[in-house]
Each structure stands twice: as C-alpha cells, then as structure tokens.
C-alpha cells in the first residue's frame, strides 16, 4: 500500500501545542465519504477523534477505611467495627508489607540506599540498557515515597475527621484528597438524620455495610493479597474504594466532565498503592492520569471490506484498516501506539504512512482506481450492517426477505447489493434475522462493477499459479537463449578478432579508394570518347559540305 516511510511525532507539551496550532490553521473538510465506496465493498464503520496524551499528572487519594461513629451510637456499633477492624488488618497486612519492601529500595532522606539506587540507574544508562520508562518509574517511586511520608504525618487528623471527602494540602507536593466511603454511609444514615434508631438496627446496618465493603476490598486487592507483587489499580477499582468521591480528585486534577467518561473507558487512569497504616486504617493511593492534547481537526476513520463479486471470483478491496484525515490530506494511521474508546483515540505518538496514488484516488470516491485481492475463504465476510441497512454479497450468501417474502437477487456484474427498508423490512442472512430501519438515499452509488484489471493476486494458491506461468515464460525465454547461443557458437571467433577487424577495415578503405579512382577513370574515358565522337562528326560534316560545293561547280 505504497511506501512505508513513516512520520513520527513525539509528545512533549510544546510539540503538542505546535501541532494543535498548526492543525487549527488547516481548513476542515468533511470526513471520508463512504457513500460512493459502499457499493464497491468498502464500508466506513465510524470516526474517532484523535488525541495525544502523556501520563504526566499525579494526585493522591487517601482512603479512610474505618469510619467514625457518632458518640451516642459508638456502643451499638462497637462489635461490628472491632470485627471489621481485625479483618481489615488481616486482609491488608500483606499489601502493607509489599509497599514497605518497595519503599526500602529507595529512601527519601538522601541516604546510602537512595544514592545506590540512583547510581544503579546511571550505571544502566552507561551500559545502554536503561529506558525512559525505568528512569520515570524511579522518579515516580521517589515522589510516591515522599507523599506517603507526608500523609503519615497527617494520619491522626485524617482519621479523626467526620468529613467524607476533603482536600489535604499541608506539606504535600501534589493534590491529595481524603475520602471515606464508609464515613459517607455513617454520615448519611446516622449523623445527618433526625430519625431515632434502636441499637440492634444500628448494629445490623453497620455490620451489613462493613461486610459489603470488605467484599469490595477483597475484589480490588485480591491479586495483591495473594501475591507480593504490586499491580496497578484500574479506575473501576478506585471508584469501588472511594465511591462517587473519586470525581472530586479528578476534577481537582483538571479532568472535565466532557472528558471523564471517555478517559474512564480508555483505562488510562490508574492507581498505585503507596501507603497502608493498620493503626488508623488509612490507605494511600497515587493516581496517575494522562495529560491530553486535543487535535480538533484530526480524526481517525475505520474501514471494513466485504467480499465482492467479480468476473474472476470473489475479491476484497485492498485498503488500510484505519486512515486519518486532516483537511484534504488522507494517510494510513498506525494505531499500535493508541488506545481507543467509543468516540476517542488516545495516542502516545502519531504515526502515519503515505498511501499510493491509486488507494488515495479510490478512497476519494474513484472506485475504478480501487484494487482487489481474490478471496475464496469460507469465512470471508459476505455482509455487513450499516446504519440500519445491510450491504451484502447476495451471490455468496442467500439474501432471503421475510417481509415482503422473496429472494433478493444480485444482478450480473454488481459487486454487492445495498438492501434497505424500502426493498426489505425483515431480512434473513445465514439464519440471522434483521429488521431494517435505515435507507440508502440517492447519494449512494449503486450497480458498481469491478473490472478484471482491478483484481490482483495476493493469495498463496493464486500466487503459486502465477509463479508457474512466470516459470513457463522463463523456460521459453531460456530455450530461445540456448538457440541463440548455439548459433553464436558456429561463428569463427578468429574472424571476429581485433586484428582481423582492423584488416577488414583497411581493405574496405582501399577498395573504396580503388572504386572511386575507377569511377573517375571511367568518367574520363567516357568524356574523351564523346569528344572524339564530336570531332569525327564535325570532320564528316565538313567533308560533306566540301563535296557538295565541288559538285555544284
């Protein structure tokens, strides 16, 4: 599909700004038009906005696991709270041990261990084996340990508060939010209500809620409880720990409501445990989320191909899976550096490949420039749903219409059939029943035929056949070459030597000289002969005149 020279764009913030400013100056045109391509078996399945991101923002969420009960209800909830506290300690102690072992690899006091750790990184760089990720991880680990130490200094005040969520800023180098899902429950059920509850009911409610939260903790930290390795926590796990209070931290870190749902679906928001204190039952988690640069004029268009009918058999179009369009420029997009959601594409770098003029012309609507590869596989897709309608190859599969009853036939030469609610309300394909609600308006091209010249060979079997034909042609050429060699072998090489050639040239020149001299001599003799003839004729005429004069006398 053309040359594979790539354009790579790194993601420093200044470069992101430059890209945004540059692309904002380009006139935005409409997205890739799939209407002329659908009948040729090329279906535009959707567009996504392209964004560049780098994981540069961090914040801390301090989960308060043990709630504070109102003074008048402490006695009622004492038993379930004590049991919950013991279970928490047993459950999260392995997690705390793993965090402690990780922190022992580097200290924040500038001591010997830190120097040894940083020296190991520098040594690795000198040996050429360290990566940017390793250095970034080391820096993040130092920062996490500093935040954990600062949080521990404030643990008593955090544990004593009755607020379900509040910002912690004293001595912290980054935004930190203390949340308490269980404290929120206690506040809603007991602190902020005038309803009087008996002690038995309080015990039951607190016990049930604590058990449910323990189940969530087990689900979130299950792998880390059974394994000493610390793994990242997903955004879903963070929401399980913090409840709806997680939005407060994300808002503080600058995540807008319009981005929140998309970022949650991308999985780019993660958390790493950095602290567990069994005395106050405080859990510290460092949250990492991306810094996103929106490329407003750039979109990714996804393409799918159907098996179409040609005079050479079934074939599929040779087009990229994903293309990107900025203004009038269309290039193939490499999505291996990207994470996709329903509406967005988040990429660490933008890598595009230029397309050949033929593919560019094809995607621009000139279906006669599209190239196809023969596909004879049984699993080749013969149909596809598009906006409530169906594009199907009714020569490859039976298109049975249930309402109104009938078989949809595909005309000879047509690549695919475009079926909408005007031609069939209920369609059955390979046992799958579809109720059609969309329509293909007049802007969709129909009755497109694929020429033989547009079908090329790419399959292994077809390539073997074509190679056989090429081998036959080569064999015929070799036979002709052998005949030519045999004729050349009959030529006396000595007659074609350099000395002989010089002799031939000299003799030829001499022959030409003699020929010219002979021609000159012949011309001279002819001229002399004609002169003699004129002299004789004159003498004869003169003698005749004298005789006539004598006779008259």
Curated annotation (Swiss-Prot):
Coiled-coil region(s): 142-170, 466-491
Annotated region described as Fusion peptide, given as residue ranges: 117-141
Topological domain spans for side Cytoplasmic: 522-553
Disulfide bonds: 76-199, 338-347, 362-370, 394-399, 401-424
Membrane topology: Single-pass type I membrane protein; Single-pass membrane protein
Keyword Nuclease carried by entry: no
Residues with lipidation of kind S-palmitoyl cysteine: 523
Pfam families tied to this protein: Fusion_gly
Major site of localization recorded for this protein: virion
PTM characteristics: The inactive precursor F0 is glycosylated and proteolytically cleaved into F1 and F2 to be functionally active. The cleavage is mediated by cellular proteases during the transport and maturation of the polypeptide.
Extracellular side: 32-500
Transmembrane residue ranges: 501-521
InterPro entries (UniProt xref): Fusion_F0_Paramyxovir (IPR000776)
Keyword Signal: yes
Gene Ontology, cellular component aspect: host cell plasma membrane; membrane; viral envelope; virion membrane
Keyword terms of this UniProt record: Cleavage on pair of basic residues, Coiled coil, Disulfide bond, Fusion of virus membrane with host cell membrane, Fusion of virus membrane with host membrane, Glycoprotein, Host cell membrane, Host membrane, Lipoprotein, Membrane, Palmitate, Signal, Transmembrane, Transmembrane helix, Viral envelope protein, Viral penetration into host cytoplasm, Virion, Virus entry into host cell
UniProt-annotated site: Cleavage, residues: 116-117
Subcellular compartments: Virion membrane; Host cell membrane
GO biological process: fusion of virus membrane with host plasma membrane; symbiont entry into host cell
Family: Belongs to the paramyxoviruses fusion glycoprotein family.
Biological role: Class I viral fusion protein. Under the current model, the protein has at least 3 conformational states: pre-fusion native state, pre-hairpin intermediate state, and post-fusion hairpin state. During viral and plasma cell membrane fusion, the heptad repeat (HR) regions assume a trimer-of-hairpins structure, positioning the fusion peptide in close proximity to the C-terminal region of the ectodomain. The formation of this structure appears to drive apposition and subsequent fusion of viral and plasma cell membranes.
Oligomeric form and interacting partners: Homotrimer of disulfide-linked F1-F2.
Protein name, entry field: Fusion glycoprotein F0
Originating organism: Newcastle disease virus (strain Her/33)
Gene that this sequence comes from: F
